[in-house]
């Protein structure tokens, strides 16, 4: 990898353009309408009752067209909806489960229109518990599921998806996740150059490997900072100690910090390069197993996409967010690759100066 090549310039320019695009869009694109909570969410079947939905960013002049409770194929629609400008939607509904159903926990869907969008929808999972009453017998008053599906497809509101618990913090997806992609990419490059050193015995390859690892550690620190701030909002804990992915990250970070300590303890440059290269090659698959494989085998992780937890690609990553998420991943990878190249150049110049001073 030549630092003065056309590829270097493309990496530098590409990273700046993509990150600026992500920063501007990620900060200023509004969030879609969402639900932040549901009050009076315990109902009895076959009895007209009301519950309240707390809406976020619905837009002025919002009108609730439909409020729906859904559990698998059971779908019920409210009979009356009243919205006030404070952000609360009061819905009256009479759920008749019928003689073939039991008490169930329902998701809430709200469909409406406002000055923001003529068609918009939002939902909140596991929001309303319907207790089956003794008088609930006979035929259920559920509606067809196809009605709900067609309404969801009519959503034309622009903006980032507004998901329960995440809300505005979903923007952190453009920073937190790319940090770990960047770290894994740089660590892979460090392994490649470690192998090159063992094959060719050239110190420049060891310097490349060291540069990639040091910037990857910076990625890990930034990933922990952005992740902890996110966790404090969504999980109400800066570092949930029982999450296997977080524990795997902590172990992996200490493994690479040990790499730096190992290098400082070895004075001979060729011995340092040889031992460090072997160490870098050995710990990379262990690190990947700790952060990518072990969490998927655990049932207790809080991170999306692991241990049965729904992943962003199935739950939150809609088309609007994809337009920024994928450029964010590429942009941050290019940016930290550029920083790694700059560090390599700095260390190369410093080594040349040291050699000149020794010769004098």
What positions do the PLM features span?
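Immunoglobulin-like IPT/TIG beta-sandwich domains and homologous Ig-like subdomains
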Residues: 45-114
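Extracytoplasmic/lumenal ectodomains and periplasmic regions of secretory and membrane proteins
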Residues: 98-140
């Amino acid at each position: 990898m030549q630092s003065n090549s056309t590829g270097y310039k493309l990496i530098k320019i590409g990273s700046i353009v993509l990150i600026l695009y992500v920063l501007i869009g990620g900060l200023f694109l509004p969030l879609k309408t969402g639900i932040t909570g549901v009050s009076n969410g315990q109902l009895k079947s076959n009895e007209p009752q009301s519950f309240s939905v707390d809406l976020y960013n619905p837009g002025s002049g919002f009108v609730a067209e439909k409020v729906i409770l859904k559990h698998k194929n059971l779908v019920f629609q409210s009979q009356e909806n009243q919205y006030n400008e404070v952000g609360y939607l009061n819905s009256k509904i009479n759920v008749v489960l019928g003689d073939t159903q039991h008490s169930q926990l329902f998701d809430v869907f709200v469909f409406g229109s406002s000055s923001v969008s003529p068609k918009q929808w939002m939902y909140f999972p596991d929001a309303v518990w319907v207790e089956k009453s003794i008088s609930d017998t006979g035929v259920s008053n559920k509606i067809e599921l196809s009605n709900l599906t067609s309404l969801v497809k009519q959503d034309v509101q622009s903006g980032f998806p507004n998901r329960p618990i995440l809300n505005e913090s979903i923007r952190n997806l453009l920073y937190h996740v790319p940090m770990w992609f960047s770290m894994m990419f740089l660590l892979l490059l460090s392994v490649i150059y470690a192998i090159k050193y063992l094959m060719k015995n050239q110190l420049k390859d060891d310097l490349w490997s060291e540069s990639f690892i040091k910037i990857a550690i910076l990625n890990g620190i930034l990933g922990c900072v952005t992740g902890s701030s996110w966790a404090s909002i969504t999980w109400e804990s800066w570092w949930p100690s029982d999450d296997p992915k977080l524990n795997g990250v902590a172990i992996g970070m200490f493994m690479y910090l040990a790499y730096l300590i190992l290098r400082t303890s070895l004075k001979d440059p060729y011995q340092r390069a040889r031992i460090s290269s072997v160490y870098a090659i050995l710990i990379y698959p262990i690190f990947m197993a700790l952060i990518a494989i072990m969490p998927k085998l655990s049932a207790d992780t809080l991170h999306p996409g692991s241990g049965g937890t729904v992943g962003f690609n199935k739950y939150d990553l809609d088309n609007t967010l994809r337009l920024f998420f994928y450029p964010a991943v590429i942009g941050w990878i290019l940016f930290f690759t550029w920083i790694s190249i700059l560090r390599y150049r700095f260390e190369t110049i410093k080594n040349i100066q040291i050699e000149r001073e020794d010769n004098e």
